[in-house]
């Protein structure tokens, strides 16, 4: 009885939060779109638009914190070899965004091949998650009390923003409690809460040890919590707090302030809009129109179905900006067709996963937006560099598909009339490329404005396609959930980055790299090996936030252009989506198709080789330019 009641309350809380997130995202879109329209058509402005957007981002993150604390896809589970098992709710893998924030989860898996007992890992991970929630509640609460004054444009108390985050932390603990009661694991929750309260209390009571480099302890603790399956934002917050006991100069309220500052930057407003574009494209059927158009162009050639998957991926990349979006969409759209025409399931799934890499390379790209915010680089230049890199990677994949085309069927040649008809139906998607890439490159609109216009454009197209209101609402809710996940990851990494900067780790890394000399070939080769290794374990968002500030100075000191290296960094980390043990793109396809991930990893090798070849060409050109 108690479990059933908790299950019902948990579902109601989840749906209420998703609805609140959808409404917040709708208000955010209306605010930014109205500001752009007034500026260009009425030669006026919307006073406080940027400030309002910043407040709405904090609201989204606060709403998403309870969902992030219970989400199974927002963590890395190396011991299972695939995403952490869920409680068996409806199976619906996330379709947008590099970070899955979907606690509907995947099927439960057997307990074989675990290297440490599941219960111990669960309790440890849960305790760390609760420590992070307590830190958010306490630190944000103190910041809310300390902050004075009001917002200059909105007239709201400045203490309201940290108060919202503190409330999100309270709801997160409630969500975790309901989940454990629903699963009949109340004792486990009490154990985790006791450990968390003890750690939080002890950290404030024990005199600091004053280590010479607290950031080293910080990195070790963060890596341990990440590998234990702790949700990524919590895996940054809790170690940063614990490191205070080792001399880190950052109290709770300072951590809360840094987190708020990190997740409320106006540039990040583009992220929910690009995620919404991908969701609306799928809901409206425009993504399916892209498939038909791609099939009409290349489906009749050697390995025609494979080339259709690739061309659709390239076209969809220019609209969604999300590799998870393409992997989920491709699994549903292409897997049945490829297997029905004789392609082995593991090869079909590997192809879909490999093509999905392009979505975070070809603009718009969520990864480049995160990198621009983390490293203070030009968003427009990064997107332009990603466009060139994406086309090069697509060319190498096309060659790999052609060489392996004996097992991939082709479709009948489309007539000229059919090609024109499919092209006309796909025109709405091509308009997005003009708005985003051309608008930013020409300097007509900022990245955030381009993203808002693209989302508004896609919303109008969805209405014109007579998309059901329920599907549009679901697209807003899904995008809001995933936006919250990304914002929380970026915000939680801000205290982490501050502590690393205070310790001068970037300078230490640069000095350690001094033995390579100023030879750009050696530097870029060493950095490639490092980033490929990082991509084996970390999600791209976390990897960018942690390693961009460390590796970028090394590359610049060797004479490598920072934009060029930024593109290489993202390409390296995206290739990690195909490599074990994590391989998030392979995991997504495996969960959607039911193909064992071990078979998918093995079948991905030809495409992995093709992408590594493209990386070598990009790296060689960067080193060559720096050399001369």
Model-derived features: positions:
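Alpha-helical transmembrane segments and membrane-interface helix-loop junctions
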Residues: 1-82, 86-211, 488
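Alpha-helical transmembrane segments of multi-pass membrane transport proteins
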Residues: 146-153, 162, 185-628
């Amino acid at each position: 009885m108690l479990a059933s009641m908790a299950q019902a309350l948990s579902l109601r809380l989840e749906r209420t939060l998703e609805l609140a997130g959808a409404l917040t995202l709708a208000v955010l879109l209306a605010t930014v779109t109205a500001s752009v329209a007034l500026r260009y058509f009425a030669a006026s402005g919307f006073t406080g638009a940027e400030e309002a957007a910043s407040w709405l981002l904090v609201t989204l993150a606060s709403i998403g914190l309870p969902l992030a604390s219970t989400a199974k896809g927002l963590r890395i589970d190396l011991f299972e070899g695939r995403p952490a098992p869920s409680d068996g709710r409806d199976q619906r893998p996330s379709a947008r965004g590099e970070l899955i924030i979907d606690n509907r989860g995947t099927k439960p898996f057997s307990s074989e091949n675990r290297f440490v007992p599941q219960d111990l890992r669960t309790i440890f991970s849960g305790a760390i998650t609760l420590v992070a929630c307590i830190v958010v509640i306490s630190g944000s609460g103190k910041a809310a009390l300390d902050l004075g004054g009001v917002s200059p444009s909105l007239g709201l108390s400045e203490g309201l923003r940290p108060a919202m985050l503190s409330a999100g932390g309270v709801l997160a603990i409630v969500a975790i409690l309901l989940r454990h009661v629903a699963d009949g694991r109340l004792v486990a929750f009490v154990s985790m809460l006791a450990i968390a309260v003890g750690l939080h209390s002890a950290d404030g009571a024990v005199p600091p040890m004053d280590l010479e480099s607290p950031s080293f302890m910080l990195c070790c603790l963060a890596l341990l919590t990440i590998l234990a399956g702790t949700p990524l934002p919590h895996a940054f917050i809790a170690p940063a707090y614990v490191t205070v006991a080792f001399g880190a100069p950052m109290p709770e309220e300072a951590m809360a302030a840094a987190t708020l500052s990190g997740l409320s930057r106006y540039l990040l407003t583009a992220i929910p809009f690009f995620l919404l574009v991908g969701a609306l494209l799928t809901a409206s059927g425009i993504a399916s129109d892209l498939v038909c158009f791609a099939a009409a162009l290349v489906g009749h050639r050697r390995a025609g179905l494979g080339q259709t998957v690739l061309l659709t991926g390239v076209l969809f990349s220019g609209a969604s900006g999300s590799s998870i979006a393409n992997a989920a969409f491709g699994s549903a759209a292409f897997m049945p067709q490829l297997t029905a025409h004789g392609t082995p399931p593991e090869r079909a799934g590997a192809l879909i996963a490999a093509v999905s890499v392009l979505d975070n390379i070809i603009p718009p790209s969520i990864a480049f937006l995160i990198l621009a915010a983390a490293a203070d680089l030009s968003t427009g230049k990064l997107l332009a560099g990603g466009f060139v890199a994406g086309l090069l990677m697509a060319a190498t994949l096309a060659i790999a598909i052609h060489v392996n085309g004996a097992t991939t069927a082709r479709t009948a040649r489309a007539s000229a009339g059919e090609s024109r008809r499919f092209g006309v139906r796909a025109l709405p998607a091509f308009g997005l490329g003009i708005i985003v890439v051309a608008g930013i490159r020409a300097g007509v609109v900022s990245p955030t404005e381009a993203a808002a216009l693209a989302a508004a454009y896609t919303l109008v197209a969805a209405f014109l396609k007579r998309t059901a209101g329920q599907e549009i609402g679901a697209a807003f809710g899904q995008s809001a959930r995933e936006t919250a996940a990304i914002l929380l990851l970026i915000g939680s990494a801000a205290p982490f980055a501050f502590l690393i900067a205070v310790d001068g780790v970037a300078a230490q890394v640069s000095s350690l790299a001094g033995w390579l000399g100023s030879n750009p070939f050696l530097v870029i080769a060493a950095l490639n090996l490092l980033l490929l290794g990082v991509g084996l374990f970390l999600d791209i968002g976390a990897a960018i936030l942690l390693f961009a500030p460390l590796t970028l100075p090394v590359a610049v000191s060797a004479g490598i252009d920072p934009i060029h290296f930024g593109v290489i960094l993202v390409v390296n980390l995206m290739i990690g989506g195909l490599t074990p043990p994590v391989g998030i793109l392979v995991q997504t396809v495996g969960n959607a198709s039911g193909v064992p991930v071990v078979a998918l990893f093995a079948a991905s090798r030809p495409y992995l080789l093709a992408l590594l070849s493209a990386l070598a060409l990009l790296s060689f050109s960067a080193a060559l330019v720096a050399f001369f």
